[in-house]
C-alpha cells in the first residue's frame, strides 16, 4: 500500500490545492497512490469530512498535522482530543520534547519532516544542540527538497539508526505523490491503522518524481 504522508490543502495558509483536485490529479495522471494524508500547518482540521471523496475516487484520505518546534517541523499522526489539549498547535516554538511526549502518551505518532533542510529541519539543530533521544523515525524523502537535502536526510538517518518514510509536501496539485511511503500492509483504512503501521516500522520511502524531460535535440 502506497500513501503520501505529507500534503497540504487550502486549509494551510500557504496551500493552494483543493482536496478534490488532488483526487482528480491522482486519477488523471495514474499516480500509484492508494491515498494521502493532509498535514495542515499549525492546526488539526477536525471539521472537514472527506468520506464522499474517498468513495468517489477510491482513495484513502486521512488527516494529521505539521507543527513547528525548536528542532524543526514535525508531523503528528493520530491527533485526538486529548492531544489537542496537550499543547498549542499554533505555537511556532514548541519544545520538540513536549510534542514527542504528548504524542506517545496519547497514542499518536510524531516524526520530524524534511530533516535535511536548513533551519526547519531536525539535523541542522543537531549540529547546534545535539540529538534528541526520543526521535526514531524521520521523513527522508520530501517532494519539496532541493538537491542535497534528501541525501543528507538519508545519510543522517542511517547514522542515527532512524526509520525513514516519504511524503510529497505538496502545496499545489501537481506535486502530490512526488514522494510517498510504501507499507507492507494493504489494509490501512483509518488513522489509527496508519499509526499502528508506523509504530510497527513495516514501511519504507519511495520516490515517484516524474523523470526530467529531455530537452536536447538530435543533430
Please identify what each model-predicted range represents:
Residues 70-74, 148, 175-177, 192-199:
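Short, charged, surface-exposed secondary-structure boundary motifs
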Residues 1, 34, 59, 108, ...:
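A structural micro-motif
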Residues 1-71, 93, 147, 172-174:
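An N-terminally biased module of ancient metal coordination in phosphate/nucleic-acid-related enzymes
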Residues 57, 71-74, 105-108:
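Beta-strand-turn-beta hairpins that frame and shape the catalytic cleft
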Residues 66-90:
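A basic- and aromatic-enriched beta-loop-alpha substructure that forms the phosphate/nucleotide-
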Residues 187-210:
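Charge-dense polyanion-binding interfaces
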Residues 2-5, 75-76, 112:
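Active-site-proximal beta-strand elements of phosphoester/diester hydrolases
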Amino acid at each position: 500500500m502506497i500513501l503520501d504522508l505529507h500534503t497540504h490543502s487550502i486549509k494551510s495558509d500557504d496551500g493552494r490545492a483543493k482536496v478534490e483536485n488532488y483526487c482528480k490529479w491522482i486519477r488523471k495522471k495514474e499516480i500509484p497512490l492508494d491515498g494521502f494524508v493532509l498535514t495542515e500547518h499549525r492546526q488539526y482540521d477536525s471539521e472537514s469530512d472527506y468520506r464522499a471523496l474517498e468513495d468517489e475516487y477510491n482513495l484513502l484520505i486521512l488527516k494529521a498535522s505539521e507543527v513547528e518546534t525548536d528542532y524543526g517541523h514535525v508531523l503528528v499522526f493520530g491527533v485526538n482530543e486529548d492531544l489537542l489539549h496537550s499543547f498549542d498547535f499554533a505555537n511556532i516554538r514548541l519544545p520538540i520534547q513536549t510534542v514527542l511526549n504528548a504524542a506517545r502518551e496519547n497514542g499518536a505518532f510524531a516524526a520530524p519532516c524534511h530533516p535535511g533542510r536548513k533551519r526547519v529541519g531536525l539535523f541542522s539543530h543537531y549540529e547546534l544542540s545535539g540529538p534528541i533521544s526520543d526521535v526514531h523515525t524521520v521523513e527522508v524523502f520530501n517532494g519539496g527538497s532541493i538537491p542535497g537535502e534528501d541525501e543528507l536526510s538519508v545519510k543522517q538517518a542511517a547514522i542515527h539508526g532512524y526509520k525513514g518514510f516519504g511524503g510529497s509536501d505538496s502545496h499545489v496539485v501537481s506535486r502530490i505523490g512526488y514522494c510517498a511511503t510504501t507499507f507492507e500492509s494493504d489494509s490501512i483504512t483509518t488513522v489509527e491503522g496508519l499509526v499502528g503501521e508506523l509504530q510497527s516500522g513495516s514501511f519504507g520511502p519511495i520516490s515517484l518524481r516524474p523523470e526530467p524531460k529531455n530537452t536536447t535535440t538530435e543533430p
